[in-house]
């Protein structure tokens, strides 16, 4: 198959074709340097300017105040599960966690290795299909931060509200939703996101952190590469940053502006998700496990009423150019991820195929 397909994978995910073409055109000779972006030193004026421009674009998109630092860090977002408690916990502290899916469960277990974490709500017994009522929890007096995952990529669960913490810093794993919907940065102490969903290719993690959270040095001392303060003081150049990822992210930030900004892509994301959910709700052939009030608009999980047909479904979808619809290995089933770069045409093609498959196999 020579033409582009629709990639419904949870990440790495689709990128806009125009961005890929731009990167292709610039690959051998970036900005008339005679070098590829992959070859240029990270402390050169060109790359320092690239990082500065990327940061400014992100600040404009999200209206990030000056009292927040923006960090471009190398590596997986999962590393933040350890970095957050290591940086933000002091002796005697206990961090509070909402466990609403696989990723927040992993984050809690990582923090609990320090024996300084407790959970406000654990939805695992119910199958991670809903979000807790926010009247049910009570924070301990020694809580330095509250952690939650607004959108659970694996389980397809989304918080319909921002938890109220009474002034305690709120930490959010926005790996699968940052830049997909409007947010008020001032409601958060720290936000982080892996880039491979809505931002760039895998290997970059963006951290947005309030300056107040950098005032206290971690106790006991932690490795310098894991210290947010070091990265903030060096403007993401404490070590070699993932330059190519930042380059693609910078292009993505500008692309989002051409799409009407965050509000524009959010409106389209809502329409895409609503269209697919409407079809799923109209048929008994497909099952949707997540309660309606907690449904993700990024990661739509579903299954077949006849599970033994799942592989046939995937094989036929692949032949139609509908890729990566298999659910996560922890949950099984099927999943369609509708990130910013997924066009409505992809959703239409998926629904057309699903309808045909249901008629032929129902």
Curated annotation (Swiss-Prot):
Its cofactor is pyridoxal 5'-phosphate. L-glutamate binds at residue 43. Its EC number is 2.6.1.52. SUPFAM superfamilies: PLP-dependent transferases (SSF53383). GO terms for biological process: L-serine biosynthetic process; pyridoxine biosynthetic process. InterPro entries: Aminotrans_V_dom (IPR000192), Aminotrans_V_PyrdxlP_BS (IPR020578), Pser_aminoTfrase (IPR022278), PyrdxlP-dep_Trfase (IPR015424), PyrdxlP-dep_Trfase_major (IPR015421), PyrdxlP-dep_Trfase_small (IPR015422). Pyridoxal 5'-phosphate binds at residues 77-78, 103, 153, 173, 196. It is an enzyme of class 2 (transferase). Pathway: Amino-acid biosynthesis; L-serine biosynthesis; L-serine from 3-phospho-D-glycerate: step 2/3; Cofactor biosynthesis; pyridoxine 5'-phosphate biosynthesis; pyridoxine 5'-phosphate from D-erythrose 4-phosphate: step 3/5. The keyword Amino-acid biosynthesis applies. GO terms for cellular component: cytoplasm. The modification N6-(pyridoxal phosphate)lysine is found at residue 197. Pfam families: Aminotran_5. PROSITE patterns: AA_TRANSFER_CLASS_5. It catalyses: O-phospho-L-serine + 2-oxoglutarate = 3-phosphooxypyruvate + L-glutamate; 4-(phosphooxy)-L-threonine + 2-oxoglutarate = (R)-3-hydroxy-2-oxo-4-phosphooxybutanoate + L-glutamate. The keyword rRNA-binding does not apply. Homodimer. Catalyzes the reversible conversion of 3-phosphohydroxypyruvate to phosphoserine and of 3-hydroxy-2-oxo-4-phosphonooxybutanoate to phosphohydroxythreonine. This is Phosphoserine aminotransferase. It comes from Legionella pneumophila (strain Paris).
């Amino acid at each position: 198959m020579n033409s582009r397909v629709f990639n419904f994978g949870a990440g790495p995910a689709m990128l806009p074709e125009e961005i890929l073409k731009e990167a292709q055109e610039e690959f051998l000779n970036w900005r008339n340097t005679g070098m590829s972006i992959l070859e240029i030193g990270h402390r050169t004026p060109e790359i320092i300017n690239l990082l500065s421009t990327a940061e400014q674009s992100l600040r404009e998109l999200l209206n990030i105040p000056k009292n927040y630092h923006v960090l471009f860090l190398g590596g997986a977002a999962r590393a933040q599960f350890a970095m957050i408690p290591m940086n933000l916990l002091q002796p005697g502290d206990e961090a509070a966690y909402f466990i609403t899916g696989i990723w927040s469960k992993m984050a809690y277990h990582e923090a609990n290795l320090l024996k300084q974490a407790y959970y406000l709500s654990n939805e695992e017994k119910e199958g991670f299909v809903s979000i807790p009522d926010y009247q049910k929890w009570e924070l301990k007096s020694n809580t330095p931060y509250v952690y939650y995952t607004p959108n659970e990529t694996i389980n397809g669960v989304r918080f319909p509200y921002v938890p109220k913490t009474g002034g305690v810093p709120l930490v959010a794993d926005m790996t699968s939703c940052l830049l997909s919907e409007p947010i008020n940065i001032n409601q958060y102490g720290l936000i982080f996101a892996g880039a491979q969903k809505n931002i760039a290719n895998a290997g970059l993690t963006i951290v947005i952190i309030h300056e107040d959270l950098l005032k206290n040095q971690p106790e006991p001392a932690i490795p310098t590469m894991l210290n947010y303060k070091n990265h903030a003081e060096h403007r993401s150049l404490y070590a070699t940053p993932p330059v190519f990822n930042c380059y693609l992210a910078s292009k993505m930030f500008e692309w989002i502006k051409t799409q009407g900004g965050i509000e524009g892509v959010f409106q389209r994301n809502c329409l895409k998700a609503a269209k697919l959910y409407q079809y799923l709700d109209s048929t008994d052939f497909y099952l949707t496990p997540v309660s309606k009030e907690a449904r993700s608009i990024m990661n739509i999980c579903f299954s077949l009423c006849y599970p033994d047909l799942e592989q046939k479904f995937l094989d036929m979808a692949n032949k139609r150019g509908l890729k990566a619809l298999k659910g996560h290995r922890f949950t099984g089933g099927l999943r369609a991820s509708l990130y910013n770069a997924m066009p409505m045409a992809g959703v239409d093609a998926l629904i057309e195929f699903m309808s045909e498959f249901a008629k032929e196999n129902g």
